[in-house]
Amino acid sequence: MVLSGKIFCIMLLRLRTFWLWAIFVSAVIIAVGWNQRERAQPLAPPLPAPVQTTPARALKWSVVKAYPHDTIAFTQGLLWHGGHLIEGTGREGHSELRRVALSTGGVLQKRQLPDDVFGEGVALAGNRLVQISWQNGRAFVWDEKTFAKIGEWKYDGEGWGLTFDGENLIMSDGSDELSFRDPKTFKIQRTLPVTFNNQPLKNINELEWIEGEIWANVWQTDCIVRIDPQTGVVKSYLDCSGLLDNKARSGREDVLNGIAYDTQTGRIFITGKWWPKLFEIAVEN
């Protein structure tokens, strides 16, 4: 059969249109399928911690100076910024975000959390302070200067400690795992199991990023561990027993909880819940 030029062109155009639609529909199906796969695919499980052949080393420390600390403050988070301490406190009805004068322990600025919220760790990411809560599943985002609320995130599970490594917010939840979270969305990017002498280390609490390491206190102890952020291995630790004299303790739940680091001077500050003092300490390398 001989086709005229006009009919042949029409058939080619129709055939071309058919194939374009076929390609388009195929692309949509592939994209939808891939998107569903992406959404359904969970985070990759954390890699197992490497075998630690050398036991964690106990580091020597000494007190450089002691400062007054508000005994009403149930300290849950601590950091140093702009010449002052930023402190997050806990307990329902008493949870606050505070800016504190180092020399006097006086509260220069504060923001009350909702009465039903038990405040926990706090971290500075850019010009925003992020403060988490214990069992409320709420992370509050505050303006660093005014303490005005500028956002809030929801998350699953408990919140204990929080710090920022310059790229991710790092959160503890009382288990032996840390979660690395996007500072813009608070979504988990990866998790890190923590081990101490090849054993899972639970009750990881308040966190501080210090010179490429995660420093953390272990709840219900006076121990501070230094965690490798890549492997989760604790290579060294500080036994801070005796830092606060027993005579200065009230007998309440006043365990060590609060680590702050001055990046400009290298000073390290430590305090605890309801402690009457905050200490600057020096640590051996």
State each model region's role.
Residues 51-72, 102-106:
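A short helix->beta-strand "capping" segment at the edge of beta-propeller domains
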Residues 63-68, 106-112, 148-153, 190-198, ...:
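A short beta-strand motif characteristic of beta-propeller blades
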Residues 64-96, 111-123, 272:
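Beta-strand-rich domains and repeat architectures in extracellular enzymes and scaffolds
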Residues 71-82, 115-125, 155-167, 172, ...:
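Beta-rich, blade/repeat-based domains predominating
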Residues 86-92, 129-136, 171-175, 216-220, ...:
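Conserved beta-strand positions in repeat-built beta-propeller and related beta-rich domains
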Residues 101-105, 143-147, 183-186, 228-232, ...:
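Short loop/turn segments that connect beta-strands within beta-propeller blades
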Residues 105-141, 148-159:
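Blade-loop segments of beta-propeller domains
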Residues 139-197:
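Hydrophobic, well-structured mid-protein blocks that either form specific transmembrane helices
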